[in-house]
C-alpha cells in the first residue's frame, strides 16, 4: 500500500448523525440514482484548500448553456447563515469520518488528482455566483464504497473513494462530476429547496436541524406535496448537469465525457432509473440526451481553454 493509502479492514459504520447528513446531501445529488453500500472500515483522504476562485486573466465568455435564473425562493433563507451552518456541519462530518478511520492523507495520488481538477474549475465559479469569490473551497476524499459526491453551500466538496475506484473514471469524467456538484452550490439549490419546503408545507426537519436553521414547519409531508417537491428536484439536477458541463469545459475538460460518465453510471446502477415522474432525478437516457445536445454549445469553451 502506498503512503496515504487505504487500509482494508473490518467494516465500521459512521454515527447516525454522519450518515444522515451524507444522506441528506445525497438526495440533492445527481449520483444517488446509483446503488451504494455502507461505509467500510478503511482510511480515507483529506484535501483542504483545493484552490481559490481567482480572477481570470482574460474576460470570460458569456454562459453558453441556457438554464435561466436561480429560483427567487432562495431569498427566504439567508445565504450567509446557510453557508456558515454548512461549514460547521462539514467540519463535524470530517471529524466523525476521521474518528472512524475514513479520512486524511494529503499525499495520496487520487487526492492530488482531485486537487488539480478543482484548481482548474474553481476560477470559473464566480461567473455563476459572485459569492463564490469569498468561499473557502475544500475538497475531501472519503473512504466509502458509495458511488457518490456532493458540494455543500459555501464550496465544501466531498468525493467518495467508491466513485473513483468502481467506475474507473477519467480526469474528464471526474471534472464533470465535480462541476455538477459545484453547480448545486453555485446555483443555491439547497437554499431554494429548504425555502420551498417551508412554503409548500413539506417538512425537511432533518435538513433544518442539521443545518442549524430551526423548524421550518410542523406539517407532515404527504404524497401530493412530495411529488411537487420531486419536480423541483429534477429541475435542479438538470440545471446542475448543464452548469457543471460548462464549468468543466471552461476548465479545459472534454464535454463529451459527460455522456461517457452517464453511460458508466447507468451500468453501475443496473440500468434501472424507475418511472420518470416519481424519480428525484432525470433518468439515465434523458440525461444523456440532454447533455449530448448541449455538448456543441460548450465545445468552443473547451477548445479555447485547451489552446
Which residues make up each language-model segment?
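A Zn2+-metalloprotease active-site environment signal
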Residues: 5-7, 13-307
Amino acid at each position: 500500500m502506498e503512503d496515504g493509502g487505504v487500509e482494508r479492514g473490518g467494516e465500521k459504520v459512521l454515527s447516525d448523525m454522519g450518515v444522515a447528513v451524507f444522506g441528506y446531501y445525497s438526495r440533492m445529488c445527481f449520483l444517488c440514482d446509483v446503488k451504494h453500500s455502507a461505509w467500510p472500515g478503511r482510511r480515507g483522504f483529506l484535501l483542504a484548500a483545493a484552490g481559490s476562485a481567482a480572477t481570470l486573466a482574460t474576460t470570460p465568455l458569456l454562459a453558453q448553456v441556457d438554464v435561466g435564473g436561480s429560483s427567487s425562493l432562495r431569498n427566504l433563507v439567508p445565504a450567509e447563515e446557510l453557508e456558515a451552518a454548512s461549514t460547521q456541519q462539514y467540519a463535524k462530518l470530517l471529524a466523525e469520518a476521521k474518528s472512524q478511520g475514513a479520512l486524511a492523507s494529503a499525499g495520496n495520488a487520487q487526492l492530488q488528482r482531485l486537487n488539480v481538477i478543482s484548481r482548474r474549475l474553481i476560477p470559473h465559479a464566480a461567473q455563476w455566483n459572485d459569492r463564490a469569490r469569498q468561499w473557502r473551497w475544500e475538497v475531501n476524499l472519503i473512504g466509502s464504497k458509495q458511488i457518490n459526491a456532493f458540494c455543500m453551500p459555501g464550496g465544501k466538496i466531498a468525493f467518495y473513494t467508491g466513485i473513483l475506484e468502481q467506475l474507473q473514471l477519467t480526469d474528464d469524467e471526474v471534472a464533470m462530476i465535480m462541476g455538477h456538484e459545484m453547480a448545486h452550490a453555485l446555483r443555491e439549490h439547497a437554499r431554494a429547496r429548504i425555502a420551498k419546503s417551508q412554503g409548500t408545507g413539506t417538512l425537511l426537519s432533518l435538513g433544518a436541524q442539521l443545518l442549524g436553521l430551526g423548524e421550518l414547519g410542523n406539517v407532515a409531508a404527504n404524497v401530493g406535496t412530495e411529488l411537487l417537491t420531486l419536480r423541483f428536484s429534477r429541475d435542479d439536477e438538470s440545471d446542475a448537469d448543464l452548469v457543471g458541463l460548462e464549468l468543466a469545459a471552461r476548465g479545459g475538460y472534454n464535454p463529451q465525457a459527460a455522456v461517457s460518465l452517464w453511460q458508466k453510471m447507468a451500468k453501475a446502477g443496473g440500468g434501472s432509473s424507475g418511472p420518470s415522474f416519481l424519480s428525484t432525478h432525470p433518468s439515465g437516457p434523458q440525461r444523456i440526451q440532454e447533455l449530448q445536445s448541449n455538448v456543441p454549445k460548450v465545445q468552443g469553451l473547451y477548445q479555447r481553454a485547451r489552446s
